[in-house]
A protein has these predicted regions:
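The feature marks the mature, well-folded catalytic cores of soluble enzymes
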Residues: 1-188
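Glycan-association/targeting regions that enable binding to alpha-glucans and other polysaccharides
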Residues: 183-256
Length: 256
């Protein structure tokens, strides 16, 4: 397996990405590196494929300045930012940061869907881990735990949202302490989400899908389909997806 070392220092708790070329950190990433700020961005692009790198001031204004203490990309189109009462000393900074991410664009050029989680006592609810079909959320035994879990359930229906107690702090919780074990042979699938603002063309709704066959065992072409159904229907329909003929996009498949 080829090994590449990039000349950059980075802490895992200060990095989040959508997996489609967009990432975010606080500006402590500049402080931790002795290279020019623009070189930090260049390395993220050249080594990690990050085309849009949001580097922002830390709204919490704590000693650690890690992004997982106040925010999290939940999916390729949803972002979670903590929320505090207007009496909180960092209220203005946190709201400014929430507005910033709500007005930035996802990989499909659409505004991010913003979700908020109530943290009046600096609860570490954003310091969670999404692992396969589960979301592991640090809880404190306080009165806002159930509401925090409900936010995750609303944002990511179908996931098993589980609260975990522990010796959590506002600057040190679950995401800070665990690591995911990657499946190096997995099949990654990315597609453009359809929503109420998506307009159909003459052949219906166009779906674009990127397949990343990490195992390199090959795709079964006649099994690559898009499935859908209407709310009033019990049966699923399907159409074949077709591979792009462009040599620049060999992993792109489209259909409608």
């Amino acid at each position: 397996v080829p090994f590449y070392a990039s000349d950059i220092v980075h802490t895992g708790g200060n990095y989040m990405t959508d997996g489609l070329g967009i990432a975010a950190s606080t500006d402590i990433v500049y402080v931790e590196n002795s290279i020019p700020d623009e070189d930090v961005h260049s390395i993220r692009q050249e080594y990690y494929g990050i085309e849009t790198y949001h580097v922002v001031d830390d709204p919490n204004n704590t000693y650690i300045d890690h992004i997982d203490c106040w925010g999290k990309y939940l999916s390729t189109k949803k972002v979670l930012i903590r929320e505090v009462p207007d009496s909180h000393p960092q209220y203005d900074e946190i709201e400014e940061t929430a507005d910033y991410f709500a007005n930035s664009l996802n990989a499909w050029g659409e505004p991010w869907e913003l979700y908020r989680v109530w943290t009046p006592g600096n609860q570490p609810y954003t310091n969670s881990l999404i692992l396969n079909e589960k979301i592991l959320v640090p809880v404190t035994g306080g009165s806002w735990d159930d509401e925090a879990l409900a936010v995750y359930e609303e944002a990511l229906p179908g996931y098993d949202v589980i609260g975990f107690t522990g010796s959590w702090e506002s600057t040190d919780a679950l995401h800070c302490r665990v690591k995911g074990i990657p499946d190096l042979q997995m099949l990654q699938i990315f597609h453009n989400p359809l929503n109420n603002g998506t307009e159909p063309d003459t052949n219906g709704y166009v779906v674009e899908v990127l397949f990343d066959d990490l195992s390199q065992t090959g795709l079964i072409e006649d099994s690559i389909k898009v499935f859908w159904k209407n709310p009033d229907s019990d049966n699923w329909d399907s159409n074949i997806l077709y591979q792009s003929i462009s040599s620049q996009e060999p992993d792109l498949w489209t259909g409608s």
